[in-house]
């Protein structure tokens, strides 16, 4: 980012619940103007590390001070109300709840991804599913703004009904 004229960034090392408790990590998050919740192999562990932690509270304070929260892949899924439980196909686990009543399906492509998202909506029928393909983002603004960015189309799934946004 510095090569493009952007400000200096830093990595906040939260890899487990212990990292989410450290005051220095929380201060870095609270002072941030942009928080990037990265992709990774295990959404459930990410959520468990952050849930009800000082780090999550620091992220909320940063957001209240106009920070942008960006979730990528598993990071985007974690921001939803519910996430896929990798250990049980017909079970959902609580997400971080930043997107109330939403289940995010990252890397959304093809019928398998659509079936997985619909299966989660069968378990949590009062939710909205957002299928986000690779190289595509969904921007949500504080005043209700919605923008699809990138070459793919975000798919919105209501229990049984699928609509491209």
Can you annotate each of these PLM segments?
Residues 6, 32, 71-76, 80, ...:
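Small-side-chain structural scaffolding
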Residues 16, 48-54, 78, 123, ...:
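A sequence-level detector of short, solvent-exposed, charge-rich linear segments
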Residues 24-27, 61, 94, 122:
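Structural motif
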Residues 1-45, 128, 139-165:
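Extended, subdomain-level signal for the structured scaffold at the beginning of enzyme domains
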Residues 37, 41-115:
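Class I SAM-dependent methyltransferase SAM-binding "motif I" and its flanking Rossmann-like core
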Residues 34, 83-165:
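C-terminal and late-domain segments of enzyme folds
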